[in-house]
Amino acid sequence: LIKLTPYAAKGGCACKIGPHILDAVLKSVQFPTNDHVLTAMGGAEDAGVYVLNEEVGLVQTVDFFTPVVDDPYTFGRIAAANSLSDVYAMGGRPLTALNIVGFPVPLVEAGALTDVLKGAMATLEEAGVVVLGGHSIENETPIFGLAVTGQVQPNKVWRNRGAQVGDALVLTKALGTGIMSTALKGDLFSEGTEAAVASMSMLNKMACEAAKNFTVHACTDITGFSLMGHGSEMASGSDVSLEIETAALPLFPHVVEAAEMGLVPAATYGNRKAITAVSGLVELESVWSDICFDPQTSGGLLLAVPLSETEELVKSLHQAGVHAAKQIGKVVARGDFDVYVR
């Protein structure tokens, strides 16, 4: 039986380079651009959009990471769902994908890469996405992901800026994948880890399609930089603040217990160090800081929508099979911090 996680020191989106380090690098590089570029490197948008004409914009994104689970097939499913997520976060429809592979040759020979690809293809078929090719290298640590191209109508792009005072904040997936992935390595809290694996394997397609029937002022997906990191980007980009209610957060079973046991990935501490425009967590139990800064892999969409539409949106999400969707807070006038946690 092949187990992938022993080959990776950090798994899933927890293996990202820290936001403060990456930001310093990106600020020192001048990236080519032109008038067709609607979104790109600036503004912390989830994907780039290149406008072809008034009706069609190309959405492009790339995502790859190290194993977050032991089973190769499941890893492929999770990696594919995660790679497609940024297109859904822009309100787009993914069309094509290219495989990105780095794998130890012994694992390839043992059939692990075959199973990873089979899992990814199952998810891509579910999404209606075709694969046009890919690239592979030999690597000591297994990595897999996809470069994805999609399309969106340029005047209907969802951005992570645009949240308005009075909007409700709706989150479509439960939090705690980093904590539960750490618990998984110790064979602990099987109910919670199974729920987390199912959530990570689930496409954000249904959430995106349901939300398109409502007024979306801003959207982002919650991944490696945590609810606080991605929430902070939405707040600062929109010149507002977010109020998050811990009692309203959707959580996987046993996440609180696992965090209390110290089953917290190292990237949580990196997020906490880098993301400082947050208020209120010091007054709460430390477990809430661990959850709010937990790096998510293939996390849900965070949507800022008019309060008047929120109840119907959540109902529509539930009917679409997005059962974890909840209102977790609201958008308020700009204060001293990006995010206030209650």
Stretch-by-stretch model annotation:
Residues L1-K10, I21-A24, V105-V130, N139-P142, ...:
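Glycine-/charge-enriched secondary-structure boundary and capping motifs
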Residues P72-L98, D115-E126, L203-T215, F225-M234, ...:
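Small-aliphatic-rich amphipathic alpha-helix that forms the alpha element of a beta-alpha
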Residues L52-V69, T74, R93-F189, G329-K330:
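Glycine-rich anion-binding loops of enzyme active sites
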